């Protein structure tokens, strides 16, 4: 069913996001079941979940790639993206949030906000994505809905408000009171939660529910001060407020990111999922509510604003690449304006390349249906795009617009990889090329000294899973080295160099002469190369060769061969020879010159620092902190609740290999930890000397 048959206001593009074990994929599975997409409920722990379609996901019981699927509910079309909760796959979360209009954050009723929930929440803040929350696993020992709501306020700074009051808890959890309709919902276990009975609120809960409802109405009145009629009703006659009036104000508050309503339930036991579906439709924004999309007009370099209209100019963002053994390369896109038709020729404005769409597919996890067109608000997949990668803009040939790009973090961990046999060499190159196209945080490079192929990623699990995929999908057998830290080099003071490259060996010689000035760039800004050549001392046609040589020279540092970052290079002077100068000579000279300048600019080695969060029983707290200190960690703070303590620290990645195993033995298996890349910092001198020796 295309969006042509759907009013734009009835479309919801949503993500489901959470910490690794909060039950996110199970929640999505139940949504698919109740909305009629699957006839049998998939269980994650049995390896049968529809959304976890990669073999590695079904084995590990975690979600790695964001599967996209479409369901219909209450007359609305909901495009759902299930995102991974493991920190090694933050890129999947990042790129999903970039193209979503709203999200459901799933929390565990026992743990509340966990470290990874904070990361995902911050990513959603960055893109201004409206969110509602679902406190899952209400049937677990120690489940506490109200404590989970409080932890959202404290740790996330969310304006979290309960819209349910649970009836019973742990194994006695039977349903919830809906504070808006003021009805108690009791789920019938024999119908798999598909049916429930509405009853009056029991006497023992009446007072608590009245208080919660009054708090909710007061909050709604304050977040929409322009709605005076609603405010007066709340103050003077709250009982006269209709459900529709509450839903209207709630919807406005959610879309404006002023409130995060919190529901409760247990997806695994089928309680509360339809209630969640109802409010996804009622409260989360449509593409219209999210407003115009901003971009840059390439012809005028002016910022432009595009309305979400079917008949508008085409503007779409490629947000994921997938390689399929039968169909080939599939590009997932989100359309912000206009309509995309099968067979049409379009422009990739990011790369200035023409593309042709051979097929359009609507995805349901890894099943697919052919479509003739996608239109504004759609999330779909295209076959036939050769040049487009994640973050590229697709538009009409005559309307050159570029949308805001997706930013990707640098990898922090390296491994050497080599084919087991000569026959595997070509297959390995093909596999690495496909995987790095799919995942922008996976990089492939060659160590110039040893000639080894190096793969880099966001963590050990990330590279492990990619290695698994090589064996399964590309049938490549490869040997992989031990994980190594992905160090970088930079300079700390300004420097300069004058370099001549002269070769005479009979016949035509080689001649190039380049003078450079270098200085540290702002941290995180990357390398910049500018030409300040005047008067043609180096002819125009050789400048690109000098720049290419400098860029290649920066790829291998002067201390230990790690790539140089945050260096600003200016080409200031030089000379040439009428006969002997060539592009090759200037390229070699550029590379030699930048190396020479860097040696004079007090180079240092930088190491990735990880943000580490450890949750441990309080009686092991001293051991955990002592161990982090021994690993050169900087303790940022700690907080305790219900006998458990959370320690937040910044620790160099080089000290964290095998940490999970040692934490397990330190705390008898009772502590858990997460870590994610935070920033790069200068390595202590003694450690720098050891790295250089190696």
UniProtKB/Swiss-Prot annotation:
GO terms for biological process, alphabetical: ribosome disassembly
Principal place of residence: cytoplasm
Cellular localisation: Cytoplasm
Cross-referenced InterPro entries: EFG_II, EFG_III, EFG_III/V, EFG_IV, EFG_V, EFG_V-like, EFTu-like_2, G_TR_CS
GO cellular component, one term: cytoplasm
UniProt entry tagged with the keyword Aminoacyl-tRNA synthetase: no
Xref: PANTHER family: RIBOSOME-RELEASING FACTOR 2, MITOCHONDRIAL, TRANSLATION ELONGATION FACTOR G-RELATED
Protein name per its UniProtKB record: Elongation factor G
Gene that produces this protein: fusA
